[in-house]
């Protein structure tokens, strides 16, 4: 529901603009209000799940998201819709931030955990394609209000199931005090960073607005890390970055989603503005990506991760992704779907279907149990910031190249396609860099698992809990070795 909402709205924007009288610049805030709230609260929400209980945070976020969806659906003014979208982003971030943390604490057996993460990864990775199709179908069949109303029964059903099925947990508590300065610095820096990125389409990268707000966001982020390094009870213990796999997996994900998000956004524009597809056709065109992700995430990746390890499953996926993007970067002005587009979409689906479950497994397996909510929030934050930054950069590059070609006398379609080609080629390059980082920097699964077991033991001893005899038997995140 939350993943779909990030793309389902895109297809309905023309109808929303017509009904509510948005200008082209103000229309962007239907998307930006959600992104700023969603990206800004993820890290804090993930950590709050560790501290006061993930089920509590999940249900609070789900309630906010569902209620805000109702407000979005009944909106009759620009201000009401933008405000409701901001609240929807807050609720979505609270729910999304703790999901992976709940998975790794509920499913402690490696095989079960791999299956659960694979299901989550399918939803996260294929949501973009499914959202485009659902948005087009609902907007054309009924009206744009229903892209929000559809969330309400899903949200209610999910809430009832969560209350009945999820185990209650108190969390580890705030110890002696809450890190209020850390929380304020975290939320303000991330919200400001996402705001700066999404507004580059209006102000440009070299403008005083972008440079000023970007510098302020970075300064606040530096202040946040300084605070966490010196606080007695930090909101985000920096020990999480002691795990190389946590750090590298998040970096690899940022590069990967930067390319994929750019491909979805610019690819949809290419299909509509160059090839003349309507909204439903765009969704159907991207459907092979979702189907390939489903086939691999739900049927194959979990078994591969359990058998060969997450790193060894990730590498082939990251190898296929840049090949798919490079193939897409040669799409002609009169493309035939079966020969020019379908192979690229199939390769992208295969690459994402192998990569997302593996990356999430690596990022979560590198964190201790008590930091699992924080690790979950970090994974989602990396995905949002990486995707927003990648989309902004690739869209700017595409626009610049299009303007150059238009000035040189190219037709509108040829100029647009020239811009898309450059952006997709850069997206392929980003994915190739992600592949190289994964190959050279990620540690084998069994090495990372042993390090986590050692850190958990050190935490137990430091708190006077004594040694955990289970550590002598097997670390919790024990996958097949990849030597």
What are the residue ranges of the model-derived segments?
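Intrinsic disorder in cytosolic terminal tails and internal cytosolic loops
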Residues: 172, 441-483
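Interfacial helix-cap and linker-helix signal at transmembrane-aqueous boundaries
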Residues: 16-17, 48-49, 134-142, 197, ...
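Transmembrane core module of solute transporters
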Residues: 3-37, 181, 206-213, 219-223, ...
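Hydrophobic residues within the alpha-helical transmembrane core of Major Facilitator Superfamily
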Residues: 36, 70-71, 86, 147, ...
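C-terminal module of multi-pass small-molecule transporters
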Residues: 53-62, 76-80, 95-99, 105-118, ...
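Transmembrane-helix bundle of Major Facilitator Superfamily
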Residues: 1-164, 299, 308, 314, ...
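Structural signature of transmembrane alpha-helices in multi-pass secondary transporters
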Residues: 2, 31-34, 38, 65, ...
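C-terminal membrane-cytosol helix-exit motif in multi-pass small-molecule transporters
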Residues: 152-171, 187-199, 216-231, 434-444
């Amino acid at each position: 529901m939350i993943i779909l909402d990030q793309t389902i709205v895109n297809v309905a924007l023309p109808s929303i603009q017509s009904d509510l009288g948005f200008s082209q610049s103000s229309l962007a805030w239907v998307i930006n209000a959600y992104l700023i709230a969603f990206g800004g609260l993820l890290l804090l929400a993930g950590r709050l799940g560790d501290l006061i209980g993930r089920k509590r945070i999940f249900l609070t976020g789900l309630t906010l998201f569902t209620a805000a969806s109702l407000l979005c659906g009944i909106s009759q003014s620009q201000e009401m819709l933008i405000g409701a979208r901001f609240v929807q982003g807050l609720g979505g971030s609270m729910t999304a931030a703790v999901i992976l943390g709940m998975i790794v604490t509920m499913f402690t057996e490696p095989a079960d955990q791999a299956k659960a993460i694979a299901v989550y990864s399918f939803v996260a990775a294929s949501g973009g394609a499914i959202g485009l199709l659902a948005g087009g179908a609902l907007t054309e069949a009924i009206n744009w209000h229903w892209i929000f109303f559809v969330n309400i029964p899903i949200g209610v059903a999910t809430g009832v199931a969560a209350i009945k099925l999820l185990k209650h947990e108190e969390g580890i508590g705030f110890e002696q005090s809450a890190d209020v300065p850390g929380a304020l610095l975290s939320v303000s820096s991330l919200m400001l960073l996402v705001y700066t990125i999404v507004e580059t389409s209006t102000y440009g990268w070299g403008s005083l607005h972008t440079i000023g707000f970007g510098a302020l966001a970075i300064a606040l982020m530096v202040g946040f890390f300084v605070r966490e390094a010196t606080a007695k009870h930090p909101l985000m213990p920096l020990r999480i970055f002691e795990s190389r796999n946590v750090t590298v997996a998040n970096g690899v994900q940022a590069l990967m989603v930067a390319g994929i998000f750019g491909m979805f956004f610019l690819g949809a524009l290419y299909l509509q503005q160059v090839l003349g597809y309507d909204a439903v056709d765009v969704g159907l065109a991207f459907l092979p990506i979702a189907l390939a992700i489903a086939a691999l995430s739900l049927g194959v990746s979990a078994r591969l991760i359990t058998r060969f390890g997450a790193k060894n499953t990730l590498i082939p996926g990251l190898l296929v992704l840049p090949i798919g993007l490079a193939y897409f970067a040669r799409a002609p002005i009169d493309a035939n779907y079966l020969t020019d587009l379908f192979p690229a979409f199939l390769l992208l689906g295969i690459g994402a279907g192998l990569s997302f479950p593996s990356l999430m497994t690596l990022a979560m397996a590198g964190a201790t149990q008590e930091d699992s909510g924080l690790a979950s929030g970090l994974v989602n934050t990396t995905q949002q910031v990486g995707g927003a930054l990648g989309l902004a950069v690739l869209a700017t590059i595409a626009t610049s190249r299009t303007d150059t070609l238009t000035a040189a006398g190219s037709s509108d379609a040829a100029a647009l396609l020239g811009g898309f080609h450059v952006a997709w080629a850069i997206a392929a390059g980003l994915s190739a860099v992600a592949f190289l980082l994964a190959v050279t920097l990620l540690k084998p699964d069994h090495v990372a698992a042993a390090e986590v077991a050692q850190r958990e033991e050190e935490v137990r001893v430091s708190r006077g809990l004594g040694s955990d005899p289970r550590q002598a038997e097997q670390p919790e995140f024990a996958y097949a070795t990849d030597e």
